[in-house]
A protein has these predicted regions:
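Fe(II)/2-oxoglutarate
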Residues: 3-35, 273, 288-297
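Non-heme Fe(II)-dependent double-stranded beta-helix
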Residues: 21-133, 169-170
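Non-heme Fe(II)/2-oxoglutarate
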Residues: 63, 210-211, 215-297
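Active-site region of the double-stranded beta-helix
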Residues: 102, 128-133, 143-154, 160-162
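Histidine-centered catalytic micro-motifs
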Residues: 121-129, 205-215, 232
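A short beta-loop-beta micro-motif enriched in histidine and acidic residues
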Residues: 126-138, 191-192, 198, 221-222
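Short, conserved beta-strand element in jelly-roll/cupin
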Residues: 132-150, 197, 228-232
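Double-stranded beta-helix
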Residues: 150-215
Length: 297
């Protein structure tokens, strides 16, 4: 798909949603998203509510160490009902509707945790590179559950890079790189980067093709972010694996070979815990397709 056509699609989205009354985002924020590929900050909940969720995460880490640990942080919304509530949070979903329309499904979630004074980082990349969708028109809310700034290793994004096609990535499998393959885009002008500084309870939203990264956490506190990766319209299909989704709002998906995930009725609901294993196995097959190496996440 050419650059001009991608820009045309972005323009159509911008014109359509500016003709409607947005539910959460201002018209200026919608314009920023379409021009730069990201928008922030958006208040989702109070600081105290966010910190309470961060404390709850530490609690379930202690109670269920096999279910949530450094190599098992994908799709935690299927194991813990308090994270499922974030997936369906009205402010989050209304903001997604402002950008993508009223029919929404969610592909996966990822809990990004950087421990204090650690070397873990995220290299320059585009999310859509290995996601295996037939279209890259989707968006990821990233909810901050701690203070996210330069010291703690906040995300940095290059404005406007979402309008290009997927560029070449090199798989490094660097042990300190949080990304599955340690994939990296070389020769990025980091001086163009914008730091997405967020307080607890705020979120950013970014496009699947915007180039972004994050540095190590040099502070003495945990940096915690919950990425809802990604919301998309029901007509977007998975081409590398099974079509497994969480229904969020509006029209239901109708994949003949697909699977709609249930919502957990309570923490560690055995039905959705089992579904999480299926979803994570499918996710790994997609993200590591054609790779000779594979990590445990």
């Amino acid at each position: 798909m050419g650059l001009c056509f991608l820009f045309f699609l972005e323009l159509l989205e911008y014109l359509y949603y500016n003709a409607c009354m947005p539910k959460v985002l201002t018209k200026e924020q919608i314009e920023q998203y379409h021009e730069e590929g990201f928008v922030f900050p958006i208040r989702v909940m109070s600081k105290d509510e966010a910190l309470t969720i961060a404390t709850k995460i530490e609690e379930v880490e202690r109670l269920f160490p096999e279910e949530i640990h450094a190599e098992n942080r994908n799709n935690l919304h299927l194991s813990f009902s308090f994270l499922d509530k974030l997936v369906h949070n009205k402010i989050v979903v209304d903001a997604m509707e402002d950008l993508l329309g009223p029919d929404l499904a969610l592909w996966a979630t990822v809990m990004f945790i950087k421990e204090p004074s650690s070397e873990h980082y995220v290299s320059w990349h585009q999310d859509a590179t290995y996601m295996g969708m037939n279209s890259n028109r989707f968006a990821t809310p990233w909810i901050s559950l701690s203070t996210c700034n330069r010291e703690t290793g906040c995300m940095t994004m290059i404005p406007g890079t979402h309008l290009q096609e997927i560029v070449s990535h090199e798989d490094t499998f660097d042990n300190d790189n949080i990304l599955t393959r340690g994939q990296v885009i070389k020769n990025i002008d980091e001086s163009l980067g914008v730091d997405l500084i967020l307080e607890p309870g705020e979120m950013s939203i970014h496009s699947g093709t915007v180039v972004h990264a994050s540095r190590p956490n040099r502070s003495n506190k945990r940096r915690v972010g919950f990425a809802l990766q990604s919301y998309m319209a029901p007509n977007i299909k998975q081409v590398l694996g099974e079509n497994i989704w969480t229904h969020v709002r509006g029209k239901q998906r109708s994949d003949a070979d697909g699977m709609t995930l249930d919502r957990p009725k309570y923490d560690m609901d055995p039905i959705t815990v089992a579904q999480r294993k299926v979803a994570n196995k499918n996710l790994a097959l997609i993200l590591y397709k054609d790779s000779d190496l594979k990590r445990n996440y």
